[in-house]
Amino acid sequence: MGCYGKYAAVTLTILSVFLHLLHAFPDGEFLMQGCPECKLGENRFFSKPGAPIYQCTGCCFSRAYPTPMRSKKTMLVPKNITSEATCCVAKAFTKITLKDNVKIENHTDCHCSTCYYHKS
């Protein structure tokens, strides 16, 4: 009978650790490996109760394809594979003016599109 008590204690300990982890990551972030998909997320800095502000957040995958021969000829260092990064950007938005005449975009739809602004 004492042996079953130890198994019950171990089982309850494992269950409590699992429940603690479940509550520690509210949006299921522990299940996501890497970056979440491109979608609308609430911007908590600009949002006010009853007036949420949304922005596009998340990741998109890059595309890779064979470099066309005509492009390869113009490269200083020819490469066989060309990649094109895609970013999570607003497909549709509305412009909003906050107090102090701060103008922002409230995103209403997101999609993955070619990145135009790259970090140097």
UniProtKB/Swiss-Prot annotation:
CC terms in the record's Gene Ontology section: extracellular space; follicle-stimulating hormone complex
Span of the signal peptide: 1-24
Secreted in keyword set: yes
Keyword Signal: yes
Gene3D superfamilies reported in the protein's UniProt record: Cystine-knot cytokines
Subunit structure: Heterodimer. Glycoprotein hormones are heterodimers composed of a common alpha chain described here and a unique beta chain which confers their biological specificity to the different hormones.
Protein name: Glycoprotein hormones alpha chain
Origin species: Nipponia nippon
